[in-house]
Amino acid sequence: MSAQRLALLTPHRVAASDVDALLPAIEAACAAGDVAAVILRLAPADERALTALVKRVAPAVQAHEAALVVACPGFAGDLVSVATRGGADGVHVDKPAGLKDLRERLREGRILGTGGFETRHAAMDAGEGGADYLMFGGLYPDGEAPDAEGVRARAAWWAEIFETPCIAVACAAEEIPGHAATGAEFVGLESALWLADPAGVARAQEALGGAA
């Protein structure tokens, strides 16, 4: 397996008023380790406002050769349009009903990621629907963390059988080595692990090396 990389998850419901504080934290975190992607979890707003927000964040992420992937749970508008017009590299959707349609619309190499699976069958459907990666774990919008052991079990099952890459998301630092040991191509870091202190990314990078 090629070297594992990191994915950073922002807090849920990022709004335009959060961006000034978020940008320097993202840049410092991306510089501190081998970050493949930042998943930007936006608060629902109108498409024009969301597009403007994405335009502000995308250059900061892409300057570090990382991909910006946009998520917006509860948004009823056109997330693909927001991502493409904002210059993002892709979109992330949970429990998608129209994954194949999204896949057809996301062209020019843009990324389609998905998560929020309640069953293995749902995960397999997502893989067959054209997702570029599957994400296991991550804080729920209410701030509750999933069972870390369950996240590891699902990620290990997926990584062993399927070719589509997966992200195993750590909500606490002590989860990182175990998540890395699943064989997942990426280990995700919740914002508590990097937002206030970019050194958390460097420590996570060291943990990946120890799990290899």
Regions found by a protein language model. Give the residues of each.
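Short, acidic/turn-prone active-site loops that include or flank metal/cofactor-
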Residues: 95-99, 117-119, 138-141, 191-195
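Conserved active-site neighborhood of the chymotrypsin/trypsin-like protease fold
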Residues: 102
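Short beta-strand-loop elements within alpha/beta enzyme cores
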Residues: 133-137
